[in-house]
Amino acid sequence: MNTDITFIIADNQDITRMGMHGYISAIFSGCRMIDVTDKKELMLALVECNDSVVILDYTLFDINGIEEFLIIEKRFPRVRWILFSNELSEDFI
């Protein structure tokens, strides 16, 4: 698999981040993973790795609504986003 991929795991729960590490490592062995626990850390990681894949727990992260997320998404157009949450609705998507 491609080991040039950088995954940014944006979640503030240790157990979820550990699970993501295990799952991603099983599929993309040797890839780079960066853990971030808040928006400030996420922004710093995106500046460093602006072509990464971000796995974001949207509900538990400190992004203030869809408008703010869309601003971040537009600022980093090469980033691919995977959002997960138990509260995402069809309207959101």
Language-model segments: residues:
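Receiver (REC) domain alpha4 helix and immediately following alpha4-beta5 loop
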Residues: 92-93
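Conserved phosphotransfer cores of two-component systems
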Residues: 47-49, 72-78
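Acidic, metal-coordinating helix/loop segments flanking the phosphotransfer/catalytic sites
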Residues: 37-53
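Conserved acidic segment of CheY-like receiver
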Residues: 3-15, 20, 24, 54
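Conserved phosphotransfer microenvironments
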Residues: 39, 53-72, 88-89
